[in-house]
């Protein structure tokens, strides 16, 4: 879960730089824009930009190539709904999103590849941030691991919300995990 889009971008950039081969399903296109501009250092990343007409073909391609990958990032659940016309029934889209993520997770389990689905917290409710209803139901009830990423001073902080072997509330701080760090690293090598 993310409240800050820049923190989400920096965290996913950090992950893609630490894994050998990443499949990145970029629904909000932010990662792709920064990647194409040369701001991100990654090892090998295959970026998929789904659209309504290509969703089935893209899903098949992703599922087939997951065996050669080390991580799949599905970014961002909230942007999934923007792929379809406004008149499309929400229940149908929620079901399609659920099936898509479950296919990715099942295939990930079969080939031992973790799947990270990102979601932005969308609106304030009584002083706190709340996920949109559809992504909340899907991610909060189906996720094996729940993380929250935000800033701690000028560093990226990952907080464990739920994990089978790490205590909830534990915080990992990534010092200097901003895009400027990745950009300078890229030009030094």
Residues covered by each model-derived region:
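Conserved P-loop
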Residues: 1-65
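Conserved beta-strand segments of the P-loop GTPase G domain that flank and frequently precede/overlap
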Residues: 25-26, 47-50, 75, 116-120, ...
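Conserved nucleotide-binding/hydrolysis micro-motifs of P-loop NTPases
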Residues: 28-32, 51-55, 78-79, 121-125, ...
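Short, low-complexity, polar/charged sequence segments that are solvent-exposed and flexible
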Residues: 42-45, 64-68, 93, 165-168, ...
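P-loop NTPase motor core
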Residues: 61-141
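Phosphate-binding/switch region of NTP-binding enzymes
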Residues: 109-189
